[in-house]
């Protein structure tokens, strides 16, 4: 039976899956202590002030936005962004494969009266022509039903981390501006995507009115999110956040852990992708195994084993060197692996 993870907290294990480091409670406490020693933790009051405010200010600057607000979850960040963008026009265009459309129930409709219109069935994103047709149909029906906002999610978890091409983002958001439709980026994994595509974060964010960033995906905070955008749009969200039960009494632990990661994220992931490219090229010189990228991919790669390799024995051999594959993918000759930033500083003598 192959092992799926290491129980040794001191081991230099490599996990080829997931969206953050495998941090134990002890790891988190150690990082908090380090942050407090170096920078000093400052408490907040219902998610206002202190270290939370510092995170908001740094995120606003990194994302090129006027303001930013802490949210306890990405679901709430996306919800409040669309709720406040759609004050009069209540219809929202979303990708059919998006988190907002598939994983939030009917929350936007039930709680904020917004109607989601999915486009781009079973694809990473809809096309500009699909968008034009939807807008045209909304204007020419018996009742004019204009759109208030549009969402782009990138990378897309349901499509193996594939990204929306930057040129497509430009064309879609330009057309929305011409039609007075606000644009929101579900950029939960934006920092990682920027490292993968080598397109600066701010080049992505300048296309959108509002941007959501996850704090637990790749930024190693246990929870939390950031929503960035215009100050006059975000300030009223302080009240909405509280109304929705999202004004945590003390959120500074979450903020501090994300701040600690921000200081090294760009350089760390740059090294991770450079190292993985070299590693994959070396592996592809071996017989019986092939690693390939997805079209417009980010950090998820496809691995194929030849019929001569037993998948279970392959996993077992890796686990003996503390290298672990996704336990949710049962042994198969075709599976995926993720580029995670601990790669480059954990050498393995295999």
Regions found by a protein language model. Give the residues of each.
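Catalytic PLP-binding core of fold-type I/II PLP enzymes
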Residues: 162-194
């Amino acid at each position: 039976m192959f092992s799926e993870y290491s129980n040794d907290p001191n081991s230099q294990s490599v996990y080829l899956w997931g969206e953050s480091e495998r941090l134990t409670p002890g790891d988190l406490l150690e990082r908090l202590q380090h942050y407090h020693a170096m920078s000093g933790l400052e408490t907040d009051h219902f998610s206002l002030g202190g270290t939370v405010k510092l995170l908001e200010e740094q995120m606003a600057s990194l994302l090129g936005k006027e303001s930013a607000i802490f949210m306890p979850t990405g679901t709430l960040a996306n919800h409040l962004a669309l709720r406040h963008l759609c004050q009069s026009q209540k219809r929202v265009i979303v990708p059919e494969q998006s988190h907002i459309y598939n994983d939030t129930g009917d929350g936007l409709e039930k709680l904020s009266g917004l109607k989601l219109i999915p486009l781009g069935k079973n694809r990473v994103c809809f096309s500009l022509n699909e968008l034009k047709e939807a807008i045209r149909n909304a204007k020419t029906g018996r009742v004019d039903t204009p759109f208030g906002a549009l969402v782009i999610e990138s990378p897309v978890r349901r499509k193996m981390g594939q990204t929306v091409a930057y040129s497509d983002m430009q064309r879609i958001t330009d057309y929305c501006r011409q039609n007075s439709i606000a644009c929101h980026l579900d950029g939960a994994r934006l920092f990682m995507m920027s490292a993968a595509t080598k397109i600066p974060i701010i080049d992505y964010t300048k296309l959108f009115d509002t941007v959501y960033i996850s704090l637990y995906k790749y930024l190693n905070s246990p929870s939390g999110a950031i929503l960035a955008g215009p100050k006059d749009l975000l300030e009223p969200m302080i009240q909405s956040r509280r109304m929705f039960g999202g004004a945590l009494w003390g959120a500074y632990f979450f903020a501090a852990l994300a701040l600690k990661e921000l200081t090294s994220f760009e350089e760390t992931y740059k090294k991770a992708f450079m190292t993985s490219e070299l590693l994959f090229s070396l592996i592809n010189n071996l017989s019986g195994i092939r690693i390939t990228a997805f079209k417009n991919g980010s950090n998820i790669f496809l691995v194929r084993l030849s019929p001569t390799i037993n998948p279970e024995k392959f996993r077992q051999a890796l686990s003996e060197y503390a290298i672990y594959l996704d336990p949710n993918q049962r042994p198969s000759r075709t599976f995926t692996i993720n580029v995670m930033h601990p790669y480059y500083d954990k050498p393995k003598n295999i």
